[in-house]
Amino acid sequence: MFGIGIPELLVIFVLILLVFGAKRLPEIGGGLGRAIKNFKKATTEPDEIDVTPSSEKKHKDE
């Protein structure tokens, strides 16, 4: 895993704890989790293509 072991992860966690504080960690974790969930959802869903004609095109034809 990129040469990062448990000691390095603990140091990173402590630094994040010092920077953001204990109160904000759940907010940051929740936001990160939602972002990952939305990214996975966006990559697995097929793209929706809008096939309805636009209203501008109708007005130009008249």
From Swiss-Prot:
Gene name of this polypeptide: tatA
One of the Pfam families matching this protein, by short name:
TatA_B_E
What UniProt keywords are attached to this protein's entry? Cell inner membrane, Cell membrane, Membrane, Protein transport, Translocation, Transmembrane, Transmembrane helix, Transport
Where mainly located?
A: membrane
* Molecular function as annotated in GO: protein transmembrane transporter activity
Family, as annotated: Belongs to the TatA/E family.
- State if tRNA processing is listed as a keyword: no
The organism of origin for this protein: Oleidesulfovibrio alaskensis (strain ATCC BAA-1058 / DSM 17464 / G20) (Desulfovibrio alaskensis)
Q: Which proteins does it associate with, and in what oligomeric form?
A: The Tat system comprises two distinct complexes: a TatABC complex, containing multiple copies of TatA, TatB and TatC subunits, and a separate TatA complex, containing only TatA subunits. Substrates initially bind to the TatABC complex, which probably triggers association of the separate TatA complex to form the active translocon.
Q: Which domain of life is it from?
A: Bacteria
Compartment(s) of residence: Cell inner membrane
Q: What is this protein called?
A: Sec-independent protein translocase protein TatA
Annotated membrane-spanning segments are 1-21
Kindly list any coiled-coil regions of this protein: none
List, alphabetically, the InterPro entries matched.
TatA/B/E (IPR003369), TatA/E (IPR006312)
| NCBIfam families (alphabetical) | tatAE
